[in-house]
Every structure is written in structure tokens, then in C-alpha cells.
Amino acid sequence: MEELTIDLKDKKYPIYIGYNILRRLIKEYWDKYSSSFLITHPFLREIYKEDLSIPEENVIYVPVGEKSKSFQEVIKISKELAKRMADRRSALFAFGGGVVGDLTGFIASIYMRGIKYIQIPTTLLSQVDSSIGGKTGINIREGKNLIGTFYHPDAVIIDIKTLDTLSEREYKSGIAEVIKYGMIMNYEFFKFLEKNVDSILSKDVDKLLYVIKESLLCKKYVVEKDEKESSLRMILNFGHTFGHAIEAKGGYRRFLHGEAVAIGMLLATYLGYKLGFCNYEVLERLKELLMLFGFKIKSPYRIEDLMEYIKRDKKAYGGKLRLILPREIGRVEIVEDIEEKDIIKILKEGDDYGK
């Protein structure tokens, strides 16, 4: 087992990474609080019943899917916590993917004005991205994660054994976020991914441990430098401005998050290439790597139809869009002065990279 530490001004917490570490670490943390509650999906509870020897009265279930990141679910779970006498010294254990983690973190941040929570991500996407850094949130019709808080967990427990039960589609979705780290700040890591596609797809344990740790080191560096996303942390949203728009346009049902981000990264890179920020090789290598991992690279939506969502992006201010565009593999730039009409014109021309 390896351990990293997120070290912030007002909070420090550990990230545990290993194989088959779940049972021991849950037992270690569960009794630290006045009462503990597991927030999870019914199917995960069933699969991990032996590892999670937790009484049913301490389990609260969440439906599968992005639709669960809603005010309705927040109220429902908060009422359950109140009925079960959760107090300010209680803790929530988020056992699931990004939906469970984002929802649980948000509830923990507002229930009784803040209680503790532990992240136990079970998808590759949540293990390398959403469980780290303290972002919580729920969706509304107008966009993804538009309601949320910055609220850090007490600990993050990453047991890569949980990836064994993921569907191939869910697993691949997480790989998009892994590729993102190579694109934004680690050229050597990007080359590693190019050379190890087959072993990563086959879930080779040693390769996976390396991929997850390297991804987390990238995110740790950025979060510690810019906790509240005032500047540097925005680079973690490479591909997400377009990706979130694609998710929202599809009603959060047609695309998984990573699938939408994969298309979003390619759209952003195509835009960067056409505007002279990066060369054609950057675009081609990203496209090739995404295709090797089995991602679709075309958006089914017209860029004009996505602009409604893009303009609500959380990085935007004063009506101005902020986009993260690549300079080269391993380096991106926050760009603020691109006109909406230019984005539409360029991406409409990109037959191979979006519609």
C-alpha cells in the first residue's frame, strides 16, 4: 500500500492506494466517529457485503446515474440522516463512483453546517479525479455541478480491486481523465500511456497502481497550489467545457463523463491547433491515443446547440469564456479572449474532430 498526503492551508488528509486494502481501512476509520453511515448503490452493497460488514441501519442507498446528483436526493438523504440521529460528530462514507462521491461530499458540507466524510471511490474516474481535491456538487437542468462547495474529506481510500467489478465502458471512461493529466502537465506520462494501452485495458495491477499514483500526483500538485480554482486549478478542466456541454445536451444519459471529456479534449485541441496554439502532431497524437483506448471522437451535436451550456461554464465570467487549450503535450494555457463566433466557425469546419 502507498500513501500520499494532500497538504492544504486549513486541511491535511491521506490518500491510501493499494490492492485489497478496503476491509482493513474501513474498519480503522468506521469507529472514529459518533456514528458512521455508508452512502452507496444497492448493487455495490451486495458485491462487497463481506468487505463492508456494516449494519443495514447504517446504510443509505442512492440510485445509479447522474440524475441522483439532485436537490431531491440531497433532501432525501438529509432526512434519513436526521431520522437516524446523525450528529455533528457523525461521518459519511462515500462508497461508489463520482456520483456518490460528489453527492455525499455536498451533503456532508451542508448537513448541520458540516460533518466529516470519507471518500472510497470504486471507479477509475473517481479514483484519479473526482474523489481528490474537495469539489462537491449536484446538477441542475441548466448544467453540471452548477451547485456545489469546496469541502475536503477526512481520507481517501483507493482499493484498485474494486475496478474488477467495473464494466468495460465504465472503466474506459476513467481513462479519459488519465489521458488528461498527460496532456496538461506530464509529457512522459503521456508517452507511458501510448506504450501501455493493452496492459492498461487489461487492468494489469502494477500498471494500474502506477497510472493512478501518477494521476494523483498531478492533481495533488495543482490542488495544493490553487485549492479554490482561482487560476492554475482551471487546467484540470481541460476538455471539460465542451465535455460538460455534451453531457448536459445528452440529458446525462447518453454519455458517461469520461466519454464526453474525451470528445471535449479533442475539440479543445482542434481549436488550439486552428488558432495556432499547438501544432498538428499534438492533435494527431491525442486523437490516436483516444482511438486506441476505444473512445468515440465525434460529437453528435452541433456546436451551436452546445453553446447554450458552454456559456454557463463555471470558468466563465462577465460573459467571457475561458478555455483550456494545449500548447504542446504536457502544457496547456488558460485562454480568455476567444469570441463565441470564432469557436462556432472553427469547430463547424472540423469534420474529423467534431460537428
Curated annotation (Swiss-Prot):
> Sorted alphabetically, which Pfam families does this protein's record hold?
DHQ_synthase (PF01761), DHQS_C (PF24621)
The EC designation for this entry is 4.2.3.4
Q: Name one GO cellular component term.
A: cytoplasm
Give residues annotated as binding NAD(+). Answer: 98-102, 122-123, 135, 144, 162-165
> Where in the cell does this protein reside?
Cytoplasm
Catalytic activity of the protein: 7-phospho-2-dehydro-3-deoxy-D-arabino-heptonate = 3-dehydroquinate + phosphate
- Which cofactors go with this protein? Co(2+); Zn(2+); NAD(+)
Q: Binding residues for Zn(2+), per the UniProt record?
A: 177, 240, 257
> Quick one: which pathway?
Metabolic intermediate biosynthesis; chorismate biosynthesis; chorismate from D-erythrose 4-phosphate and phosphoenolpyruvate: step 2/7
The family database entries (InterPro entries) matched by this protein are listed as: Dehydroquinate_synthase, DHQ_synth_AroB, DHQ_synth_fam, DHQS/DOIS_N, DHQS_C
Q: Which SUPFAM superfamilies match?
A: Dehydroquinate synthase-like
Q: CDD domains, alphabetically? A: DHQS
Q: Which GO terms describe its molecular function?
A: 3-dehydroquinate synthase activity; metal ion binding; nucleotide binding
* Gene Ontology process terms (BP): amino acid biosynthetic process; aromatic amino acid family biosynthetic process; chorismate biosynthetic process
Co-factor binding details: Binds 1 divalent metal cation per subunit. Can use either Co(2+) or Zn(2+).
Q: Briefly, what is this protein's role?
A: Catalyzes the conversion of 3-deoxy-D-arabino-heptulosonate 7-phosphate (DAHP) to dehydroquinate (DHQ).
Cross-referenced HAMAP family: DHQ_synthase
* Family recorded in the similarity comment: Belongs to the sugar phosphate cyclases superfamily. Dehydroquinate synthase family.
Could you tell me what this protein is called?
Answer: 3-dehydroquinate synthase
Which species expresses this protein natively? Dictyoglomus turgidum (strain DSM 6724 / Z-1310)
